[in-house]
Amino acid sequence: MKKIIHVSNFNLIRLKGCFQVGFPFKISNGLIRNGYSVLNYPDRDLCRMFGFGHMNFIGRNRLNKHLINFCKVTEPDAILIGHADLISNETLFEIKRLFPALKIM
């Protein structure tokens, strides 16, 4: 079974589950129904958590480091980026360097 990390704005903390029928959830559910193992990675919620309640440069830096460590632990086959503007290109290049066979979509 292929592992996919879905990086998107899931609004889990801020809106308290208000948008659980949004597009990120629909994309994840569609991938699960097609036989993939999907790990949802809420980038904006984690940035707020790492930035002490605000989306600031401290949260962004820690978020990018956390994504690299998260990929090292989970060893995904693909990363699906959905409106994740907080993830830097350098982070994606570093993940691609660590896992050359990884697909970034």
Spans of features found by a protein language model:
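Nucleotide-activated donor-dependent transferases that construct or modify glycoconjugates
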Residues: 2-17
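Generic cytosolic/nucleocytoplasmic N-terminal low-complexity/intrinsically disordered segments
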Residues: 1-2, 102
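Extended catalytic core of nucleotide-activated donor transferases of GT-like folds
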Residues: 9-10, 22-30, 34-105
